[in-house]
Amino acid sequence: MITANEIRHRFLEFFRKNGHEVVDSSSLVPNDDPTLLFTNAGMVQFKKIFLGQEKRAYSRATTSQKCLRVGGKHNDLENVGRTARHHTFFEMLGNFSFGDYFKEDAIRFAWSFITEELKLPKEKLYITIYRDDDEAEKLWQSVAGVPSERIYRLGEKDNFWSMGDTGPCGPCSEIHIDQGADMACGPDCGIGKCDCDRFLEIWNLVFMQYDQAPDGTRTPLPNPCIDTGMGLERIAAVCQNVRSNFDCDLFQAFINYTAELAGVSYRKDSEDTDTALRVIADHSRAIAFMIADGILPSNEGRGYVLRRLIRRAYRFGRLIGLEGSYLYKTALKVVEEMGGAFPELLENKDFMARVVREEEERFNKTLDKGLLLLEDELSALTARNSTCVAGDVAFKLYDTFGFPLDIVNDIAEKRGFSVDEDGFKKLMQEQKSRAKAAWKGGGEQTLAARFQALLEEGIASEFVGYDHLSAESRIIALLGEDMESVEALPAGAAGYLVSTRTPFYGESGGQLGDTGDAVSETGSAEVTDTLKPSAKLLVHVVKVSQGELLRDQAVTLTVREGQRFASARNHTCTHILHAALRKVLGDHVKQAGSLVGPERLRFDFTHISAMTPEEILAVENEVNRVILSDIALNSEHMAYDDAVQKGAMALFGEKYESEVRVVSIPGESVELCGGTHLRATGQAGSFYITSESGVAAGVRRIEAVTGWDAVRLFMQQRAELHEVAGLVKGKPGDIAGRVKTLQKEVRTLKKDMEKLAAQAASGKGRNLMDSVEEVNGVKLLAASLPGANVKALREVMDDVRSKLTSGVACLVAVDGDKVHMLIAVSKDLHDRFTAPALIKDVAARIGGSGGGRPDMAQAGGTDPQGVEDAFACLRQIMGA
């Protein structure tokens, strides 16, 4: 039997031998494509090439692309585990031509691979083509030898592909395999008539040959392209002669492992058990790959999809008897089985397991409470002969207990109920609207639109700041505060200035924009910030201090040297810190965000738990070691692929052009970075971590200072240390020991004070019996014990109860603005009074509440002035 791993290997090798570049799978997070939540097809990483916006060194490529389809038009989540073909995560095998070969070679390659490499029987293969694609039909007949009776013409819905309403598009051909009459859905089963599994589509060949205009007209592309896709899971099932993708070797290892954990059997127990095992197998793959690609559980965007998958898989595990944390084990099984083909799984193995386990434990705390609420709702609906779970109930389950809507749907549907999804969505939208109303925006969308308009007008600027802090330039655009173009900015006016070239670094990559001055023949302005809306546009935020600035005039731009150097120092230390964290904590550490300014640096990174003091010190020492080694930095421009092969770290979520700048500290760090840096690490001087904290699940944050800022902070803390040493009458080097000694002395004194207080209270207690009164035939002792703590109060009450064999006792101790109260009732009076019943009304008089057993109750209050009123209330209750 041919394995899925072998199919993947054969596919890539086949196309490599036919002149294709084997390109690694891109991340599940699309690079610089806001239209996509996840990479969902092989062509996504080549989209800019197809659009003519990017060129690469090769014109033929082949990949095995990681894909995820959850949400949007590809929302198959409810079908996953219940059908033979639906998945969240899958691999797409594909070959691509960028203006190189076209239909004839694409058809030849595909037919050769499936009939010669995979040895699928030709007589069982059928082809669908676009209804007007006469060329494709002739080629399938002449190149592949497919007879006309096995070629079907279908419409645009089935056999025409487009990237969107406009842009590259073209007809496609699909290869189908006949799996046998026993797979038919009925007597009318056939290609183009149904979607059953008898005639199963296994490969789609897209011939991008047109450019579609907004009005729908199509013109031929000058360089037609090829984009093909074949699902690995599907072709593996076909080659292994199994009827379901879940029965191929890609899934069986996970299904069998989970079945063993749960003590159940696949295909032998119930269909519900089989569904649960398939869901867990599918979701475990998606979860492992998502975390390996830097996605972490959260309540929005990609992170929420991950959280949904973890929680959905976890609930299905509970349905087959799994308890505690178990999903992290199935995710580790994914690493074991697929880490060879995808090394990122191995690199993030431990981190991934910890993230999943923490999320499991978090959900487990609320799962039972949420299920109880839903069960109560379903019971109430049954009693009312209703079958729809209200939207507000579904929303409460989501908002309070963390139940994704699909989990509520799963449970409700299984019991014969539906869910008011419209009501749920309305409440979700109201919540989002409230959040938006609470946020005061800054007009970022207006800025972005205006800057995009400048780019479309051909306005661009060149950055020369790596080598110069001052440059002569020409003003090519001026905008007022309202973002409208102006010919001049007068004194006192604020606005935006764009020049042909500039030494000012625009905010990007976490580094803040430069500040400085702009001086022309007619005026001068302070540059308060520099923006970088795109790689080709740098915008100075200015405030004119004297005269006026005019469009199309010469201008001298000068960066503030001190601030630039301070920012460069912090940026270089950010790179050193990143490397140090990976060395101390492990290779799972990845940058999750940063802020680099002249005064400090902030670095967010993936790590599941708080750093220990020892780890923080180790990181600090490592950074300072690199600084004191005074290593010269290197920076060079090269192709992105070459940089990655060189070991440069591409930071998660960052956009990179085809040519990138690589900043390296030899022997320590290599990163893709466009920021400004020191010439050598020694210029940083020193490094000091000021805080380490958590900012999200699995994300930690370090804040630090460098150079003189670090020295000043050290000197300040040293002065404070000397001051503390003086206060505790010790030396700076002995402070820890001296403080421990003082703490021990304080504990001893506290115990002595408690003992004295207890003795005093006990003495007071012995005298209290003289204060016993009688109310309505019942003995009552109501007394206050000044200076007694709770422990002493209890000891006195025990003494009083031993002496007052029948009666009620109420003792009160006041500690500042806090009031402690105890009420005891002897057993023979329980038919008339109980301690909890008495204390409920009495404690209200001291601004508190309490409870307890029939014989003893306690309360706390905040109104010492109400003590006598409380005693009077007790007498009144007993006398009634």
Swiss-Prot record:
Binds 1 zinc ion per subunit. This is Alanine--tRNA ligase. Belongs to the class-II aminoacyl-tRNA synthetase family. Consists of three domains; the N-terminal catalytic domain, the editing domain and the C-terminal C-Ala domain. The editing domain removes incorrectly charged amino acids, while the C-Ala domain, along with tRNA(Ala), serves as a bridge to cooperatively bring together the editing and aminoacylation centers thus stimulating deacylation of misacylated tRNAs. Pfam families: DHHA1 (PF02272), tRNA-synt_2c (PF01411), tRNA_SAD (PF07973). It is found in: Cytoplasm. The keyword Aminoacyl-tRNA synthetase applies. The keyword Cytoplasm applies. Catalyzes the attachment of alanine to tRNA(Ala) in a two-step reaction: alanine is first activated by ATP to form Ala-AMP and then transferred to the acceptor end of tRNA(Ala). Also edits incorrectly charged Ser-tRNA(Ala) and Gly-tRNA(Ala) via its editing domain. Keywords: Aminoacyl-tRNA synthetase, ATP-binding, Cytoplasm, Ligase, Metal-binding, Nucleotide-binding, Protein biosynthesis, RNA-binding, tRNA-binding, Zinc. PANTHER family: ALANINE--TRNA LIGASE, CYTOPLASMIC (PTHR11777:SF9), ALANYL-TRNA SYNTHETASE (PTHR11777). Gene3D superfamilies: 2.40.30.130, 3.10.310.40, 3.30.54.20, 6.10.250.550, Bira Bifunctional Protein, Domain 2, Threonyl-trna Synthetase, Chain A, domain 2. Zn(2+) binds at H571, H575, C673, H677. One of its GO terms (molecular function) is zinc ion binding. Its EC number is 6.1.1.7. One of its GO terms (cellular component) is cytosol. It is an enzyme of class 6 (ligase). It comes from Oleidesulfovibrio alaskensis (strain ATCC BAA-1058 / DSM 17464 / G20) (Desulfovibrio alaskensis). One of its GO terms (biological process) is negative regulation of DNA-templated transcription. Its main location: cytoplasm. SUPFAM superfamilies: Class II aaRS and biotin synthetases, Putative anticodon-binding domain of alanyl-tRNA synthetase (AlaRS), ThrRS/AlaRS common domain, Translation proteins. It catalyses: tRNA(Ala) + L-alanine + ATP = L-alanyl-tRNA(Ala) + AMP + diphosphate. Its cofactor is Zn(2+).
